[in-house]
A protein has these predicted regions:
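Short, Lys/Arg-enriched N-terminal segment that forms or immediately precedes the first helix
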Residues: 422-434, 504-521
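Short amphipathic alpha-helical interface segments
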Residues: 435-455, 462, 515-537
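Short loop segments at secondary-structure junctions
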Residues: 242-243, 417, 500-502, 518
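Conserved N-terminal catalytic/coupling substructures associated with nucleotide/phosphate chemistry
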Residues: 10, 14-306, 312-426, 447, ...
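Short, cationic-aromatic polyanion-contact patches
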Residues: 489-510
Length: 537
């Protein structure tokens, strides 16, 4: 038996060890550096040893506010060494007033003196501007990353301004009259194609009753100036002649590629108008999108490698929301790993990877988007992104991936993957029972449970980016519908896919094993019979 003194000694030792750990953690917190150690797109260091010129300071701040905003530390060297703010710049209120007076329109920032390693530094917090900011002497800057990952300020040229304003939803470039274009640059054959699309793709049928001029005006394909009609950017994109688009809108290019390993099987670049390009790319896809059949009752249902609806919506989104001021092409690439659709211009202001499926629909080119909706090519609710995710989820495949998106382009990747037939049947049966498609949040949660197997509400909310309250409401409905099973109570409560799904998978696996065993038994019997016959001889 252990003596009481020994037990007390152990307790004291345990407490001492824990006390040392706590003290160590506290020391780490107390000595933790508040100022970052290196510069990024949103972090800038400025030396103030020689009293930084005010024009240079304002110029740096203009570049940051015209990009993503961020924090500027005055009194820190480029390598992160803290050298301190000059006495002339130690007044935060004076710094804020200086920046407001030296920017057009006036920029409001927050400044304060902070102390790091016993040295004072001026910290300036810079918001991302909702418009273009210039210095008072007319200098417009933006911020970018160099190849080595370090940031720099560069001029924002006049041709870049429309793209920036479009990304901030302050300008609709697609609604502008295209300089140099005339009505002769519109192709009558493309207008016929437009009418056919409206007729056969559930477009706005009232448009078919209009004359050509009325149709052009209704879709804002043309604008009147001084009594003369001129094509807009949208008009040229939809109805323009290919050679004139190449000349007047050289940014409106598209590429379709098929790559097998390092071999290029197809590489087609075009400047055709969008309606012709959509149809051409859809035809190309049919040749490179094999199908697998699934038994569903008495029927055999084809399952494509890539969902047709998801591909179509991804294509429409790429052309509809791209930045037409940037000289880059929309790229569709079918590779061994999957399908990639990339388009110039990052997400517009307010859209990011976490809120893709929840943010209110708004695009970079509202007039073009509206025309595509009324024609019948784009999702009328503006929720085409839901269709892209639905196209993968209903077949039990990995979710579409936007993680490679940057500030300069949006990149959608849809992975090649075998369909989960049991999961697909479960979704199909439920949708047949309801007489409608399942909501996107229900599909996201079912997909999360399919891949993760077992999750709590908090984990579901984190994986799907759905708020906990909404996630709980959706999950409980899925439990009531028999698609999800719940176990445990309160915080320990977790959820899995309905056992029916797993039972069906196990049954199929068992049937396969039994069939293989029967084949092996027959083979063994025949082999034994032949062996006996040979032995008799």
């Amino acid at each position: 038996m252990t003596s009481k003194r020994t037990q007390n000694t152990r307790v004291r030792l345990f407490c001492c060890k824990n006390a040392r750990k706590v003290i160590g953690l506290l020391l780490e917190v107390w000595t933790m550096r508040m100022i970052p150690k290196k510069e990024t797109l949103t972090i800038e260091f400025k030396s103030d040893i020689d009293c930084l010129d005010e024009k240079e300071l304002v110029s740096e701040i203009v570049g940051m506010t015209n990009t993503e905003g961020g924090v500027l530390y005055l009194g820190v060297e480029d390598n992160g060494d803290i050298t301190g703010v000059h006495k002339k710049h130690k007044d935060p209120n004076g710094a804020m007033a200086l920046i407001a007076n030296k920017t057009v329109p006036s920029l409001s920032v927050r400044a304060e003196i902070i102390e790091e390693e016993g040295i004072e530094v001026l910290q300036i917090q810079i918001p991302m501007s909702k418009t273009i900011i210039a210095t008072s002497d007319g200098k417009i800057q933006r911020r970018r990353l160099k190849p080595d990952g370090s940031p720099e300020n560069v001029p924002m040229y006049p041709y870049e301004i429309p793209g920036r304003l479009s990304g901030l939803s302050q300008l609709d470039y697609s609604a502008q009259i295209l300089l140099g274009a005339t009505m002769d640059d519109l192709d009558e054959n493309e207008r016929d194609r437009l009418r056919n699309i409206i007729k056969y793709r559930k477009g706005d049928k009232t448009l078919l009753e209009l004359t050509d001029e009325e149709l052009d005006k209704a879709l804002q394909l043309v604008k009147e100036e001084a009594g003369v009609l001129y094509p807009t950017v949208t008009g040229m994109l939809l109805l323009g002649k290919e050679d004139r688009i190449a000349e007047l809108l050289p940014t409106a290019k598209a590429v379709f590629q098929v790559l097998e390993g390092t071999k290029v099987r197809k590489n087609e670049q075009t400047s055709k108008p969008l309606l012709a390009t959509f149809e051409m790319f859809e035809e190309y896809m049919k040749a490179w999108n094999p199908e697998k059949e699934m038994e569903y009752g008495l029927f055999r249902v084809p399952i494509p490698e890539f969902s047709d609806a998801a591909y179509r919506e991804g294509l429409v989104n790429a052309f509809c929301h791209r930045d037409y001021t940037v000289i880059q092409a929309v790229r569709v690439a079918i590779e061994d790993e999957g399908l990639t659709i990339s388009s110039p211009g990052g997400f517009i202001e307010g859209v990011n990877l976490k809120n893709l499926l929840t943010v209110e629909p708004h695009g970079r080119n509202p007039v073009l988007a509206d025309a595509l909706k009324r024609i019948g090519l784009a999702e009328k609710t503006g929720r085409g992104i839901d269709r892209i995710f639905e196209g993968s989820i209903v077949f039990g495949r990995p979710l579409p991936d936007y993680s490679e998106t940057t500030s300069t382009y949006v990149k959608l990747f849809i992975q090649r993957a075998e369909p989960d037939l049991a999961f697909t049947k479960m979704i199909s049966n439920e949708e047949n029972r309801l007489g409608r498609s399942l909501p996107i949040n229900s599909l996201l949660i079912l997909s999360a449970l399919q891949s993760q197997r077992r999750l709590t509400i908090a984990e579901i909310a984190e994986v799907t980016n759905i708020g906990e309250i909404r996630a709980k409401a959706v999950v409980e409905k899925l439990v009531e519908a028999g698609l999800v099973d719940a176990s445990g109570n309160n915080k320990a409560r977790f959820y899995i896919l309905s056992s029916k799904v797993y039972k069906e998978q196990e049954l199929k696996q068992l049937e396969k094993q039994m069939a293989m065993q029967q084949q092996q038994a027959v083979f063994n019997a025949i082999t034994a019979e032949h062996r006996d016959a040979i032995m008799t001889l």
